[in-house]
Amino acid sequence: HIWKVQEVNHQGDSRLPLVMKVPRIKGGEDPATIVGFEVEMMILPMLRGRHVPQFIAKGDFTRQPYIVMERIEGHSLRPRLDEAPLAIDEVIEIGSRVATAVHDLHRQNLVHLDIKPSNIMFREDGTAVLVDFGLSRHDHLPDLLDEEFTLPMGTGPYMSPEQVQFVRNDPRSDLFALGVMLYHFTTGERPFGAPDSVRGLRRRLYIDPVPPRSLRPDCPAWLQEVILRCLEVQPERRYQTAAQLALDLQDPGQVALTRRAEKMQKSGAIKTFKRWFFALGAEPAHERMKVAEQLERSPIIMAAVDIDHATTALLQQLQETVRRIVLT
């Protein structure tokens, strides 16, 4: 249950608009729902910044469990799926803002693990806000979902290959989900359908999606490069941080094009069979590193710019670029 509530001061004036979440606790309720609520109760108080709802209060399970948090006005990104494909400029803008928000969460030692349009909202100034942390994993907290359940946890269309293989600590899983979302907004189609079984989920380990440009000819080659890089099966072949993804979306001229940008059809039967064969019973070769360790491994690029003879306009543009880099 979710209710709109208000915090009122001693003068009777309402302050920050709030929502209260209360779990349904009845016989026959899905245990994952209850555990997920407990996970969110643990995680939300540890998060800060404009990309998450502000935490206000909570109640424990010994009396009445609840969470009170800031209410983000407006709608989620979910209704835009019904309008896909969107204009390319809008796809880029959405992707850049959401990638910036995802990177902010990763810097706070959190992997969301359920990035999808219904869990993304926007403030009035356009800042993306991520909500619903019931499936998330925080490096400094016990992973209750990993301890309690033996099935992959997530939303079928957006789950990364490693999530299907029970890996829950890799921030690059969120980049895969972002790639699914960008693909859908660009083409109007889901890259891997909407599977509802483990067998269906495992197909993404060996079957690659139809290249976006074959479904939408006006999709730029660089954007296809970005999307297909996010959707790589192996995390090592994706973007290593959401900040890198955001920067590429903000500055397409710097995107290095590979064979991904040129693809116009899916891989052939022989290549797909090889992938299927190697995926049989395969477990990911995965290091159990923390989110901060993964971010530290990512390359940092520094550029020196001669501004001795720069115009005022150029200096302002450089300042704006640096500001955006720092924010991401």
Where is each model-derived feature located?
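Protein kinase catalytic-loop region centered on the HRD/HxD motif
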Residues: 100-110
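Conserved short submotifs of the Hanks-type protein kinase catalytic core
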Residues: 62-76
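Structural helix C-cap motif within protein kinase domains
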Residues: 187-191
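AlphaC helix of the eukaryotic protein kinase fold
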Residues: 24-46
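Activation segment signature within eukaryotic-like protein kinase domains
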Residues: 94-95
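Activation-segment/catalytic-loop signature of the eukaryotic protein kinase fold
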Residues: 58
